[in-house]
Amino acid sequence: MSELYAEIYALVKLIPKGRVMSYGGVARHIGHANYSRVVGYALNALGAPGNKVKNVPWWRVVNSQGRISNSSTFDAADRQRDLLRAEGVEVGDDYRLSLRNYSAEVIVYEKLRKKLG
């Protein structure tokens, strides 16, 4: 696993249940504002055969419009919607949610600030 992917996974683990963050938000918080696609690639790699990384709540990352992104995996959007709903996030049948209501940006920023001292 690359160091960059490890940073992405560590940050995604900071997103609390019932909250979400955008791909771009994750990228900004790790210091690579233009790497939102890389965040997507890293999260997609979690499902790759032989991947040993566990306990990364990939479903808590959505696009910048508050929508679950389509995936190469047939049922991934439905799985993500169901996992978010199980955490209390209101996700519409159109796979949209309110970033205003569920964003973890400030929470993650505070966790990082405390961690870095």
Regions found by a protein language model. Give the residues of each.
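Nucleic acid-binding interface residues in structured DNA/RNA-binding domains
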Residues: M1-G117
